[in-house]
């Protein structure tokens, strides 16, 4: 039987990451994210973190919605569903262990893939000779 491999971030288990302070955790992150945390969280990010902590305790039962696409996924967010704004709507993002250290905005795409229809009459030079239905 194949066991699921235990998740580790830079050699630390999720439990060890949860017991770390924000400063200790920041030392494990890549430089861009580390510098972002070192500068401190913005008021919007602090508000989001407060909502997440309330929701973990069961005191906040509305869906957590945010415009903070630049918020770094922290270990305490794992298991939560956060609705991230993509410029048009709030996209539900289920936070998994593998997402730790990434930005929330990476998981809510701002552009959708263009699916072109068939070209219309006059779209090309050869379509001049096609009979119009």
UniProtKB/Swiss-Prot annotation:
* A Pfam cross-reference name: Ribosomal_S19
Q: Which keywords has UniProt assigned to this entry?
A: Ribonucleoprotein, Ribosomal protein, RNA-binding, rRNA-binding
Task: Give the CC-aspect GO terms.
Answer: cytosolic small ribosomal subunit
Q: Which residues form a coiled coil?
A: none
Q: Which domain of life is it from?
A: Archaea
PANTHER family per the UniProt record, alphabetical: RIBOSOMAL PROTEIN S19P FAMILY MEMBER, SMALL RIBOSOMAL SUBUNIT PROTEIN US19
Ribosomal protein among the record's keywords? yes
One GO MF term on file is:
rRNA binding
Task: Please give a single GO biological process term from the UniProt record.
Answer: ribosomal small subunit assembly
**Known partners and oligomeric status:** Part of the 30S ribosomal subunit.
Q: What name does this protein carry? A: Small ribosomal subunit protein uS19
Gene name in the database record: rps19
Family per similarity comment: Belongs to the universal ribosomal protein uS19 family.
Q: Does the keyword tRNA processing apply?
A: no
Q: What does this protein do?
A: Protein S19 forms a complex with S13 that binds strongly to the 16S ribosomal RNA.
* Source organism per UniProt: Thermococcus kodakarensis (strain ATCC BAA-918 / JCM 12380 / KOD1) (Pyrococcus kodakaraensis (strain KOD1))
């Amino acid at each position: 039987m194949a066991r699921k491999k235990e998740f580790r971030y830079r050699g630390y288990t999720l439990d060890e990451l949860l017991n770390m302070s924000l400063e200790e955790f920041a030392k494990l992150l890549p430089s861009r994210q580390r510098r972002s945390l070192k500068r401190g969280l913005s008021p919007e990010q602090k508000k989001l973190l407060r909502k997440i902590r309330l929701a973990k305790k069961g005191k906040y039962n509305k869906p957590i919605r945010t415009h903070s696409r630049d918020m770094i996924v922290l270990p305490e967010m794992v298991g939560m569903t956060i609705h991230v704004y993509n410029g048009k709507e709030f996209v539900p993002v289920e936070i998994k262990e593998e997402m730790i250290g990434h930005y929330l905005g990476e998981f809510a795409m701002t552009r959708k893939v263009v699916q072109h229809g068939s070209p219309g009459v006059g779209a090309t030079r050869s379509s001049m000779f096609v009979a119009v239905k």
